[in-house]
Swiss-Prot record:
Protein localization: Secreted
Keyword set includes Glycoprotein: yes
Physiological role: Serine protease inhibitor, which acrs as a regulator of the classical complement pathway. Forms a proteolytically inactive stoichiometric complex with the C1r or C1s proteases. May also regulate blood coagulation, fibrinolysis and the generation of kinins. Very efficient inhibitor of FXIIa. Inhibits chymotrypsin and kallikrein.
Gene that specifies this protein: SERPING1
GO biological process: blood coagulation; complement activation, classical pathway; fibrinolysis; innate immune response; negative regulation of complement activation, lectin pathway
Organism per entry: Oryctolagus cuniculus
Residue numbers marked as site, Reactive bond for chymotrypsin: 2-3
Main location: secreted
Record's protein name: Plasma protease C1 inhibitor
Length: 18
């Protein structure tokens, strides 16, 4: 699951920063 979260963070960095 960690890999999926990492990929999501890379694809949607603005959401992670929010």
């Amino acid at each position: 699951v960690a890999r999926s979260l990492l990929i999501f963070e890379v694809q949607q960095p603005f959401l992670f920063l929010l």
